[in-house]
Amino acid sequence: MTPQAFYQVLIEHGITLTDKQKKQFETYFRLLVEWNEKINLTAITDKEEVYLKHFYDSIAPILQGYIDNSPLSILDIGAGAGFPSIPMKILYPEIDITIIDSLNKRINFLNILANELELSGVHFFHGRAEDFGQDRVFRAKFDIVTARAVAKMQVLAELTIPFLKVNGRLIALKAAAAEEELISAEKALKTLFSQVTVNKNYKLPNGDDRNITIVSKKKETPNKYPRKAGTPNKKPL
């Protein structure tokens, strides 16, 4: 997907990028490739692949109408090089983005990226989701949590749901259909007082399969969740 094809798809969805936004995506691509030489950020470095499999893929929740350009508080868990939240922030500057990542080198990259892109309303924290999920500053404070190819729902639910306000939404993006995964996650979702409201398969413009799952939080999370770092992965609910 060339940058021009990317812009055209957005126009077809009613979004026309300004010159500033186009430049932000261009700078994002350049910094991603430069920094990838120093730290492992992505296996995808070809320009057209980055625009398709990182930029376009990241904005799926916007293109499908699940996020609008309003002062939503969004937490991105395990964003790596900033996906999906930074492309969404470029598109919709009104949203407020927080990223938690367990690798400090990636946080350093994100700080430089945000500075170069002149983004405001972005916050980056180094650490484990399990630890932040028990911190009152972060717990039950977000409208939306996003996670792109982070973990199976059975594990992901415990890492993300505690951060949501009641009626907040987890938006999980994956490469493959998630039917079996959701069956395995039924107990975890019930324990965390949350339920699946959307589970939708779609395709990228090149035909690759993708899946978006949205989980809504119905009641406050029991205090004991998330359990200590590493436990959700080793002993899923």
Curated annotation (Swiss-Prot):
Annotated source species: Streptococcus agalactiae serotype V (strain ATCC BAA-611 / 2603 V/R)
Protein name in the entry: Ribosomal RNA small subunit methyltransferase G
GO terms of molecular function: rRNA (guanine-N7-)-methyltransferase activity
Stretches for region Disordered: 216-237
Cross-referenced InterPro entries: rRNA_ssu_MeTfrase_G, SAM-dependent_MTases_sf
Subcellular location(s) of the protein: Cytoplasm
Gene Ontology cellular component terms for the protein in this record: cytosol
Pfam family, one: GidB
Family matches, as Gene3D superfamilies: Vaccinia Virus protein VP39 (3.40.50.150)
Chain's role: Specifically methylates the N7 position of a guanine in 16S rRNA.
Protein's gene: rsmG
Disulfide bond residue pairs: none
EC id: 2.1.1.-
Family assignment from sequence similarity: Belongs to the methyltransferase superfamily. RNA methyltransferase RsmG family.
Residues that, per the record, bind S-adenosyl-L-methionine: 78, 83, 129-130, 148
Keywords from the named record: Cytoplasm, Methyltransferase, rRNA processing, S-adenosyl-L-methionine, Transferase
